[in-house]
Regions:
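Gly/Pro/Ser/Thr-rich low-complexity, intrinsically disordered segments predominantly at protein N-termini
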Residues: 1-181
Length: 181
């Protein structure tokens, strides 16, 4: 994803963009997010529906799907693919998104977002206390779950093509084969 401006931007600059603009503010840089592929959307839909059934329907929290702004600090406003906020979370839901670190963030990577999802955003999610970070790669059919511990993000569950991954926060297993079919 090409950077549009070199000058460090802030939330004030970001909020001047028209609603629905396909950008994220990553470490003070305005980054364009191209529309995801059909398969990306299929994977996202399947994960969202599993989470919706297990969280929202049971009144254990909220699940949001992109585009949805997550305000972490003055230079970082992200639009993760899926955001989970559990019932007792300390994040603040506001009209334009949320302020603070959600309990779980899920990124479904694509060639244009991989660098940001795997490095830049991952570092910021870790710093601000996202409890679990799920990285799903539809191309390689891998699904990784990281838990934020005193040592930072540590991989706690991983599967490729087949198998189960388990969220410790949700005590939920997901069948990877069903997600990628």
């Amino acid at each position: 994803m090409p950077k549009l401006k070199e000058k460090k931007l802030t939330i004030k600059d970001y909020e001047k963009l028209p609603e629905g603009s396909p950008y994220q503010l990553i470490k003070g840089a305005l980054i364009m997010s191209p529309a995801p592929s059909y398969y990306h959307q299929e994977v996202e839909k399947k994960v969202f529906l599993i989470l919706y059934e297990n969280i929202e329907k049971r009144k254990n929290g909220k699940v949001f799907i992109a585009p949805f702004d997550v305000y972490l600090d003055d230079e970082n406003v992200y639009q993760p693919d899926i955001v989970v906020i559990l019932k007792n979370s300390k994040v603040k839901i506001i009209e334009k998104g949320i302020e603070g670190a959600p309990d779980i963030i899920i990124e479904i990577i694509s060639p244009s977002t991989a660098y940001y999802d795997l490095i830049e955003k991952k570092e910021v999610y870790e710093k601000y206390g996202v409890k679990e970070y799920w990285i799903i790669d539809p191309k390689s059919k891998t699904f990784e779950i990281y838990l934020n511990s005193e040592n930072g993000f540590e991989i706690i569950s991983k599967a490729k093509i087949k198998g189960l991954v388990k969220s410790q926060i949700l005590n939920l297993e997901l069948n990877v084969e069903e997600i990628f079919e």
